[in-house]
Each structure stands twice: as C-alpha cells, then as structure tokens.
C-alpha cells in the first residue's frame, strides 16, 4: 500500500477535520482529484472529503456548516478560515436525463462510494495517515498515464454524459491517453452529449482547450465525434482538423475562441451568435470580436496608427498571440513598438474634451462629436500635438 509522508499544507490544514470525524467513530478520507494530483506532484487547488457520517451527523460535529447539497449528502464545513465539502458515502441509481442520479442512497462502505466515480485516477482515497486506498488500479493508470473509466465505461457515460468531455479534458490537462475501451465507449455514445447543458459543456471545452496537451485532446474530441454534438461544430471536422496541427496550444480563453472562429471561417456578423450559442459572456464576446477584427486587418495590410489606437494594447497583444499560434507571419515587435510610440493610447489622454469645444463656441450635437473624433485621429497620427494650444490653432483654421 502506498503511503505519502510529506503532504502539502492544504491537506495538513484539513487533518483536524478528518480527526474530528474519526474521533466521533466515523470513517473519513480525502478523495478524488486532490489525491490524484498529490500523487502526480501537481498543485492541489482544493480538497474533497468523504465520510461514513450522515449529513446531520457532520453538522453536529462542526459549529459552522452550510447545506450546499444536503439532499445528495454534501455539507460544506467552515473550519479555521477554510471551507471543506464533506460528502457522505453514497451510491447512485437511475439516470433518466443522463446528467444526474434520480436516487442517492447513503451507505457505510467506502468501496461502494468509489465504484460510482468516473475514472480510476479519480477513484482514489487517502486516509489521515497518508495511506492511499486504490480499489481500481488508479495508481497504476497514473503511472501508465491512462484515463480509464471505473468498471463499464458505457455505464459511466450513461450516468453522466458530461464524463465524455471530462475524459478529453483530463487528456489535455494531464497529458494522458484514453484507454481503448473508454475511447470506444465515447465514440459509441457521443450523441448523449446533446442531453447536457451548454454551460457544463463549455466549462469542460475551455479547460480542454487551455490544457498543455490540448491539440492531442482536440484530435480525440474530433475522432470520437463529440464535436458533432456541440454548437456550430457539426459537419465542420475538416475545418477544425487544423487545430491539432497548430504550432502551439492557446493559454488564454480569448485566443481559444478566436482561433476556433478563424478556423471555422466564420463571417464577422456571425461571431456574436456563435459566442451566444456557447453561452459566453458579452465581455468575452466583445473581446473576441475585437481580436478577429484586428487579425483581419493585420492579415490584409499594415494597420494604421489609428487602427492600432482603436484596438488598444490588450487586443493587440491577444491578436499577436493568436497569429503566433496560427503560424501567421506578422511583425509583432514592430506593431508593439508602433503602439507604444503613439502620442495617446486612450481617449481620456486627449488634451481636450467635448466641454472644451463648447467653450470654444461649438454647439452640442453630431458636429461636435465629429470634430472631437477628427482631433483624436490627428493627434494619434501625430499631425497635431496633444496640447490645448495646438488644438486651438487647428480649430481656428476650421473657422
């Protein structure tokens, strides 16, 4: 049996929680992704605890708790400034919607609880002494760098079809391969993904797209036909098959969506609809639209100073990132140097505003807005100095 002696601080801080449960006569273990990650020597973001104690019994042991999912056996305990999700050992049955169990039964056996987990590498538990409980050879699969469903993969994917997306996501993040039967079960059941909300699919897709192994995972995403069951990807395998051949994997979400849109050869007027279909925020949609606009400009010609000003620093850096990933030859240093040399980089830096123009005798209205815009363009292109005096001279010449 494997024993881990030097546990990260996130575990040692939680030890008193397990100890209190054990002192009360219950079993308690760390479980799931945190155990997997500590075995892989990866950073552990948060921990989950599983116990033989029923939710009400957990609540009796700790002063502060929140009923986060008490119907399914989960209580969040607040202890020493940290929050811990503690879930009762359980079995699940009846998955009519392919998303969540119709029935949850609390059990007193860790083995039964681990059987319901998605993949062997996640069906690992660790006790307070650092001993690893591994019923399904998850440690061996970690060594082999393999993602294998617990038990029958068809059953696991019928229980929650999102697990198919989680499989390719873990491929990307952990740089693992899919076990043969697990991959075949995804290919045979990919249409079940249509039963899952876009929000849940999107979360897994983004994690897959930003993983270090995303190009390899994306190939499996295409080969298993999962791509046929997500918004706007059906019938687009030929266009999307460029993704696995990219020089680099994206590390920013804006780059991920921009690259997908460029590969799909999507007209600019369709971007908003596409992003909404994927349940992206308005802010994310706007950022991606700005990147695509500048990317198109750079692909056609060297952008003017004013076009660089309109794009802004964030959009410029993100667009250069997208071009770099796509292998698009652009003079990125020259573009950044030109942007940094602009007299102003945002409208608020202009020496005058609308009030100044009114003081000069202009009436509020469209003409004033047009004049202000022209002044901004002239300042950005260094045709007028960014001073009130120089702008006054320009206004006098207009009269």
UniProtKB/Swiss-Prot annotation:
One annotated GO molecular function: CCA tRNA nucleotidyltransferase activity
Keywords: ATP-binding, Magnesium, Metal-binding, Nucleotide-binding, Nucleotidyltransferase, RNA repair, RNA-binding, Transferase, tRNA processing
Catalytic activity: a tRNA precursor + 2 CTP + ATP = a tRNA with a 3' CCA end + 3 diphosphate; a tRNA with a 3' CCA end + 2 CTP + ATP = a tRNA with a 3' CCACCA end + 3 diphosphate
Binding annotation for CTP: 33, 36, 117, 160, 163, 166, 169
Required co-factors: Mg(2+)
Binding site for ATP: 33, 36, 117, 160, 163, 166, 169
Sites where the protein binds Mg(2+): 46, 48
Function text: Catalyzes the addition and repair of the essential 3'-terminal CCA sequence in tRNAs without using a nucleic acid template. Adds these three nucleotides in the order of C, C, and A to the tRNA nucleotide-73, using CTP and ATP as substrates and producing inorganic pyrophosphate. tRNA 3'-terminal CCA addition is required both for tRNA processing and repair. Also involved in tRNA surveillance by mediating tandem CCA addition to generate a CCACCA at the 3' terminus of unstable tRNAs. While stable tRNAs receive only 3'-terminal CCA, unstable tRNAs are marked with CCACCA and rapidly degraded.
Family label: Belongs to the tRNA nucleotidyltransferase/poly(A) polymerase family. Bacterial CCA-adding enzyme type 3 subfamily.
Protein name: CCA-adding enzyme
Naturally occurring in which organism (per UniProt): Lactobacillus acidophilus (strain ATCC 700396 / NCK56 / N2 / NCFM)
């Amino acid at each position: 049996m494997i024993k881990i002696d030097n546990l990260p601080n996130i575990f040692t801080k939680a030890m008193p929680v397990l100890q209190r449960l054990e002192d009360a006569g219950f079993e308690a273990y760390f479980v799931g992704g945190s155990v997997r990650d500590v075995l892989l020597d990866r950073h552990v973001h948060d921990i989950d605890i599983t116990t033989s104690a029923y939710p009400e019994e957990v609540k009796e042991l700790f002063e502060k708790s929140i009923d986060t999912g008490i119907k399914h056996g989960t209580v969040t305990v607040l202890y020493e400034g940290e929050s811990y999700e503690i879930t009762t050992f359980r079995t699940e049955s009846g998955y009519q919607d392919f998303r969540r169990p119709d029935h949850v039964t609390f059990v007193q056996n860790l083995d039964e609880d681990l059987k319901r987990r998605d993949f062997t590498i996640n069906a690992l538990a660790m006790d307070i002494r650092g001993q690893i409980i591994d019923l399904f050879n998850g440690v061996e699969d970690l060594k082999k760098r393999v993602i294998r469903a617990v038990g029958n993969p068809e059953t696991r994917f019928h229980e929650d079809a999102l697990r198919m997306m989680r499989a390719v996501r873990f491929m990307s993040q952990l740089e693992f391969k899919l076990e043969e039967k697990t991959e075949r079960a995804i290919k045979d059941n990919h249409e079940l993904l249509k039963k899952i909300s876009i929000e849940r699919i999107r979360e897994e897709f983004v994690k897959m797209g930003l993983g270090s192994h995303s190009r390899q995972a994306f190939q499996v995403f295409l080969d298993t036909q999962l791509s046929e069951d997500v918004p706007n990807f059906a019938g687009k395998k030929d266009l999307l098959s460029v993704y696995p051949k990219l020089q680099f994997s994206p590390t920013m979400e804006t780059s991920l969506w921009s690259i997908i849109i460029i590969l799909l050869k999507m007209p600019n007027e369709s971007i908003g609809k596409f992003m909404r279909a994927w349940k992206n925020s308005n802010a994310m949609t706007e950022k991606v639209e700005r990147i695509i606009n500048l990317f198109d400009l750079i692909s056609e010609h060297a952008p003017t100073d004013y076009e660089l000003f309109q794009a802004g620093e964030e959009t410029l850096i993100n667009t250069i990132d997208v071009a770099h990933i796509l292998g698009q030859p652009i003079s990125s240093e020259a573009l950044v140097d030109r942007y940094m040399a602009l007299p102003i980089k945002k409208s608020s830096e202009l020496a005058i505003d609308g009030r100044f123009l009114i003081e000069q005798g202009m009436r509020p209205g469209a003409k004033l807005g047009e004049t202000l815009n022209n002044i901004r363009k002239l300042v950005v292109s260094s045709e007028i100095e960014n001073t009130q005096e120089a702008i006054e001279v320009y206004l006098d010449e207009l009269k």
